[in-house]
Amino acid sequence: MRMEEIPVPEVGPLDVLVLVMAAGVNFNGVWAARGKPVSTLKMHPEQDIHIRGSDASGIVWKVGSAVKRWKVGDEVVLHCNQSCGECPSCNGEDPLACGYQKIWGYETNWGSFAQFCVAQSQQLLPKPKHLSWEAAASYGLTFFTAYRMLLGRANMQPGDNVLV
């Protein structure tokens, strides 16, 4: 891992550019550094960079031409799940079941460990006002891990009891 200056990424029609105020740390960064279980650079060779980081909080800096929900200046939290946006799962069912699904900042070139990050607009959530930038950047990936375990592997249903 090294620090280097690169151009600010361009946004596509459904993308958002975010000024990163805080970035969360998780085990994806360790895997990326070790190249195990997969090499992040070999996984997506379309660009000669890999910016780690799968969680962030920040301020919307620029929006793509088709983005409707977000505007410049919005305070947001970014979660890690990228999806196709076109399949039935993405359009009303469960985006976490999308067959295209990728973990942003691990299975993609761009992540949160940069001054600016580019993400799909559907990855953004409003930043809770009562949370600091750091606290807001810390829960995205862990939330989706728990969600997938409870609703996927454990097959939890409405009305089931859980211990938190």
Question: Positions of the model-derived regions?
Answer:
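Cytochrome P450 core scaffold surrounding the K-helix E-X-X-R motif
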Residues: 28-34
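Conserved Rossmann-like nucleotide-binding pocket used by diverse enzymes
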Residues: 2, 26, 59, 163
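NAD(P)H dinucleotide-binding glycine-rich loop of Rossmann-like/cofactor-binding domains
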Residues: 19, 31, 43-46, 54, ...
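Short glycine/threonine/proline-enriched tight-turn/helix- or strand-capping micro-motif at secondary-structure
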Residues: 1-7
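Glycine-rich beta-strand-centered segment in the early N-terminal region that forms part
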Residues: 7-25, 37-91, 123, 128-131
